[in-house]
Amino acid sequence: LLDAFDQQYMVFQNIHRFRNISKFEIVLPNGGAWKQAEAICNYVNNLSEELVEPEELMSDFDLSIAALGRILKEYREILAEGNLMDFSSIQIETYHLLQDNAVILDELRSKITHIMVDEYQDTNFIQEQLIFLLAGENKNICVVGDDDQGLYRFRGATIRNILEFPQKFANGECRIIPLVINYRSNSGIVDFYNRWMDATDGAKFKFRWENFRYEKSIEPHEKSTLRSPAVVKLAGVDDVDEWHGNILRFIHELKVSGKLTDYNQVAFLFNSVKHPRVTALARFLEENHINVYSPRSDMFFQRDEIRLAL
């Protein structure tokens, strides 16, 4: 069974087979083998989880789509030769096992009366197909999710599953129960969230949320009793020096006030810890005597002491 790294490494080892595919260069221009392997994995995972078969693509008149079909076919042949499976192929095999074997499907359905799925906004197409396949005609399915927290699109998840869920049932069959009380977050965070969703909707951002979320306003479980604000704005313009300085001052204020007993109580969340903006902030903090732990940032070999040792 291949995890994400194993999968990419397997493609990397066989990159010559993919590069020999006709019109390969249309889909993946010249580049490093590792990057091409990563792109191939993304393509085959997304196609597989949408239940797309290679033959469907290979017969297309569009050369790039036909090339994608050949890439998917080659990838599956490599899996078969090595008797290997990845996460997407597990889902595919499960789907076909149930779809093509009525006895097995009926036996499973006889043991399942209700299906409950949490974090439904993070499910993909094939997972929804499996859920409805197992539920059968009864469709006793309960799903819980938040369309504003659809974070796993990069792994094939689609927000359409939760937005269009009621449409999978006849009129009156699907009951929607809004869960608008937030028991986890400080009321200041909840208020900021509501203001943010309102502010980003409309002409200013050239975007309308109405097609991508259920209309709602979240309420905090209780009003915050903290004297300190839960949400702080540290930069108003795209000025790196101002951003660095404000963050440093904010951390120092937390430490001096006793709200921090150790700098390791501070965590930063970024899309990528390797982004130049992020590594620049880390270097700035370390220059100001605040150590940063970020093992995936590739900063290790940039440290003076490591360069001297090498």
Regions found by a protein language model. Give the residues of each.
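Alpha-helical scaffold elements adjacent to nucleotide-binding pockets in ATP/GTP-utilizing enzyme cores
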Residues: 1, 6, 10-14, 130-133, ...
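Short, polar/flexible loop-turn hinges at active-site or ligand-entry regions and domain interfaces
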Residues: 1-3, 15-31, 54-60, 78-83, ...
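A basic/glycine-biased coupling hinge at the interface between accessory DNA-binding modules
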Residues: 1-93, 102, 110, 139
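Phosphate/oxyanion-binding active-site loops and adjacent basic polyanion-contact surfaces
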Residues: 7, 83, 87-90, 185, ...
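Short basic/glycine-enriched coil/helix segment immediately N-terminal to the Walker B
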Residues: 98-115, 136-137
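SF2 helicase catalytic motif II
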Residues: 108-125, 142
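Conserved RecA-like helicase ATPase core segment
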Residues: 125-234
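Core RecA-like ATPase module of SF1/SF2 helicases and allied nucleic-acid translocases
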Residues: 245, 252, 256-310
